[in-house]
């Protein structure tokens, strides 16, 4: 929603250019700022419904300058809130998860991201199942420096906030066109955004979008995948004021796309996943 109106992101010639990377990263900063402040188990915390309000998104979008980085993205004040209701989050999320994307021969689509958190979870075994260590997805700091309650603070019976983002994109006829998702802890959001922009805006097929260099920002520096040759366009961002940092960004994107009645699959080369069909 935040990046849709920007022409600098649209079309094949925009692929991985500095202006496009900057706009995407700035939108991600704003999104993470709101997510970290407001998102938690809705059974315990009233999540603001106005986070996706068009007028609110318009105001947030005005904070994005195509060729300039913001110093720090602050959470907004969505409609219905008189003040920023929750404190500064202190959650640390471990990268580890599994993604399955399916379209069957009748056109039914399924995207599932599953996790037990770290590799082998808590390392405890019960009747053939490994138990998770999902408590690490909570903030263990219940209040911030100002004494304001943190939305994602740990509590009995509460579900931890997750970054999992299994995604199904529907076409104009309501039929699934893209089914995707990824493991990767709190960076899952960056990987899914990269894949969707790559396919929808830059015209990449499912495999090329999955293999595309990972990048983005969670509110801090602009992260660029260190396991691939660093893009010069990323270094251009320093002139915009972005602090560019090479990082380990091990995605596991699995995508199925419907193109002209044909299904194409893309499996992230960074992990063991494969694309298969009958």
Regions found by a protein language model. Name each.
Residues 77-87, 144-154, 238-240:
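Short Pro/Gly-enriched beta-strand edge/turn motifs at strand-loop
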Residues 103, 108-178, 202, 206:
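Active-site rim segments in enzyme catalytic domains, especially the processed small/beta chain
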Residues 117-119, 184-185, 220:
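A short acidic/small-residue loop/turn micro-motif
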Residues 262-278:
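Low-complexity, Gly/Ser/Thr/Pro-rich intrinsically disordered linker/tail segments
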């Amino acid at each position: 929603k935040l990046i849709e109106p920007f022409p600098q992101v649209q079309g094949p010639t925009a692929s991985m250019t500095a202006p496009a990377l900057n706009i995407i990263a700035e939108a991600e900063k704003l999104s993470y700022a709101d997510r970290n402040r407001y998102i938690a188990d809705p059974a315990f915390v009233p999540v603001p419904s106005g986070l996706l309000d068009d007028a609110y998104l318009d105001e947030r979008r005005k904070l994005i300058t195509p060729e300039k980085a913001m110093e720090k993205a602050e959470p907004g004040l969505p409609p219905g809130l008189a003040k920023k209701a929750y404190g500064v989050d202190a959650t640390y999320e471990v990268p580890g998860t599994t993604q399955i994307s399916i379209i069957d021969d009748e056109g039914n689509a399924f995207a599932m991201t599953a996790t037990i958190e770290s590799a082998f979870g808590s390392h405890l075994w019960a009747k053939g199942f490994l138990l998770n260590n999902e408590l690490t997805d909570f903030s263990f700091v219940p209040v911030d420096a100002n004494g304001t309650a943190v939305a994602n603070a740990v509590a009995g019976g509460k579900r931890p906030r997750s970054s999992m983002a299994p995604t199904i994109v529907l076409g104009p006829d309501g039929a699934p066109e893209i089914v995707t998702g990824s493991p990767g802890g709190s960076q899952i959001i960056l990987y899914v955004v990269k894949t969707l922009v790559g396919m929808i805006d830059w015209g990449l097929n499912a495999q090329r979008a999955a293999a595309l260099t990972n990048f983005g920002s969670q509110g801090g520096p602009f992260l660029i995948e260190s396991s691939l040759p660093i893009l010069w366009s990323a270094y251009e961002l320093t002139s915009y004021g972005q602090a560019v940092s090479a990082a380990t960004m091990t995605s596991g994107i699995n995508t199925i796309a419907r193109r002209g009645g044909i299904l194409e699959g893309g499996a992230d080369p960074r992990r063991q996943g494969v694309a298969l069909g009958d």
